[in-house]
Curated annotation (Swiss-Prot):
Organism, scientific name: Edwardsiella ictaluri (strain 93-146)
Quaternary structure and partners: Homodimer.
Cofactor binding, note field: Binds 1 iron-sulfur cluster per subunit.
Keyword Repeat: no
PANTHER family in alphabetical order: IRON-SULFUR CLUSTER ASSEMBLY 2 HOMOLOG, MITOCHONDRIAL
GO molecular function: 2 iron, 2 sulfur cluster binding; 4 iron, 4 sulfur cluster binding; iron ion binding
Binding site for iron-sulfur cluster: 42, 106, 108
Name the UniProt record assigns to this protein: Iron-sulfur cluster insertion protein ErpA
One annotated Gene Ontology cellular component of this protein: cytosol
InterPro entries referenced in this protein's UniProt entry, alphabetically: FeS_biogenesis, FeS_cluster_insertion, FeS_cluster_insertion_CS, FeS_cluster_insertion_RrpA, HesB-like_dom_sf
Keywords, comma-separated and alphabetical: Iron, Iron-sulfur, Metal-binding
Cofactor(s) it depends on: iron-sulfur cluster
Keyword Iron-sulfur: yes
Amino acid sequence: MSDEMAVPLQFTDAAANKVKSLIADEDNPNLKLRVYITGGGCSGFQYGFTFDDKVNDGDMTIEKLGVALVVDAMSLQYLVGGSVDYTEGLEGSRFIVNNPNAKTTCGCGSSFSI
């Protein structure tokens, strides 16, 4: 998708650049970053990230800087209006989800409730 189109989930330049670097390390240009939501964590739901070389029926693909972020339809409904970012700080380096739909989040930011 073009940056000009409204997408329900933003994929930041920082996240896309990190994905590009990790894909180059794996030497597999077909890999995409998949973000998903599962039940669990201290707040009820938790975010997960994995690399995947498949796009399933119903998945949304968001492209940026030549790499792709993939999210399944069920997870997307909880992520609409949010963004996937990458941060490096004192607590380490990680992909993060900024989710305006989350009513509460845990201290580490990987778990939330709606």
